[in-house]
Amino acid sequence: MKFRPTYETSGDLKKETLAVKRFIASFDGDVDFAKLPIQYKMDFCLIDNKTVCTFVEVKCRTNKKTAYSTYIISMSKVVASKSYSDIGINCILLVQWTDQMGWVDMSHNEWDAKIGGRKDRGDWQDIEPVIHIPISEFNIVGET
């Protein structure tokens, strides 16, 4: 059996960790966070008094927030977030653009689904059902 390659690098993980720390700090939050295993389909969990309260999917982009009118994410991430919502765990998508950071609640929204994805890696599994989230729906954390 051939396994799909892992594309996340240690540099990616450092950027994602920094983004989560900035996000928590922006709320003057006294919460901890932990990296989640891959089977959870989210990157981190936020922990308040040893209780998991939120799962966070983090994306660090190399473009400005205004470069596109929507943000695309794998439908499987949104489906997973709705499942977690059923057991009381909120899920957010946190995006660090080059000029701003924003987040959106993944559990309580309905967005357009289309076929899309990236083509630069030559991986046929990168083309899949994706969800288009309007950039206007993101809550802005602040300038970075």
What are these regions (language model features)?
Residues 1-36:
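Acidic-basic catalytic patches of nuclease active cores, encompassing PD-(D/E)XK
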Residues 26, 47-49, 84-87:
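Alpha-helix C-cap/termination motif
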Residues 34-35, 55-57, 92-96:
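A structural signal for short, well-ordered beta-strand segments and their strand-loop junctions
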Residues 40:
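Beta-rich catalytic cores
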Residues 44-64:
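Conserved catalytic cores of phosphodiester-cleaving nucleases, focusing on short active-site segments
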Residues 61-84:
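Mg2+/Mn2+-dependent nuclease catalytic core
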Residues 82-110:
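Nucleic-acid nuclease catalytic cores
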Residues 102-144:
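Intrinsically disordered, low-complexity terminal regions enriched in charged/polar residues
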